[in-house]
Swiss-Prot record:
Species in which this protein is naturally found: Brachyspira hyodysenteriae (strain ATCC 49526 / WA1)
PROSITE patterns (alphabetical): TOPRIM (PS50880)
Similarity remark: Belongs to the RecR family.
Name used for this protein in its record: Recombination protein RecR
Gene symbol of the encoding locus: recR
Annotated NCBIfam families: recR (TIGR00615)
Length: 201
């Protein structure tokens, strides 16, 4: 068997990416081999500077070029409304609907005992501090439909109430298929879910 060490190593690294199997990783590795040196250098430079150039917004924890992201620094956004999402791709999906003009808070995960993700592993403490230090009128929870999402939403609701938050706490409706998630939902369905959001009791 003709094993090429460098190619095998590259294939192994690529196959660690989500959704990439060994065969696809091999095809991508061969594609990169066929690329010219200029492209490979540019590709390498971007990868090596990824953590240096991309930051977490100090307010909402979105990915950003700067310490404060474009949304949080935009005076035209409704800063009295916070949409809580699990991840950056979920935030992008909601932005794409053009039906929400508030700001965001990215948790970085959902409570999941089976996966070993507890309350302290996601940014609930930071959310409460943010709400307590600002004049917030509405918290909109926008999670995909799952048991972990329900658990996390319920905990956030209880914690906000325990901290005397008197504004609205809403949650998007499930126009989204249970087999889907926010990141992959079509914009029309997601927009309707936002417009039809309901108050949590």
């Amino acid at each position: 068997m003709n094993n090429i060490q460098s190619l095998d190593k590259l294939t192994q690294i690529i196959s660690r990416l989500p959704g990439i199997g060994t065969r696809t990783a091999m095809r991508l590795a061969l594609y990169l081999f066929d690329c010219d040196d200029e492209y490979l250098k540019e590709f390498s430079d971007v990868l090596s500077s990824l953590h240096e150039n991309i930051k977490l917004c100090q307010v909402c924890y979105s990915l950003s070029d700067n310490d404060i992201c474009d949304i949080c620094s935009n005076d035209k956004r409704e800063h009295n409304k916070i949409c809580i999402v699990e991840s950056y791709p979920d935030m992008l999906a909601i932005e794409k609907t053009e039906e929400y003009n508030g700001v965001y808070h990215i948790l970085g995960g959902l409570i999941s005992p089976l996966k070993g993700i507890g309350i302290s592993d996601i940014r609930i403490k930071e959310l409460i501090e943010r709400v307590n230090n600002n004049s917030i009128e509405e918290i909109m929870i926008a999670f995909s439909a799952s048991l972990e999402a329900d658990t996390t939403a319920s905990y956030i609701y209880k914690t906000l109430k325990d901290n005397n938050f008197n504004g609205r706490i809403t949650r998007i409706t499930y126009g989204i298929s249970l087999a889907s998630d926010i990141e992959n939902a079509d914009s029309r369905s997601l927009a309707r879910s936002i417009l039809d959001r309901v108050d949590m009791n």
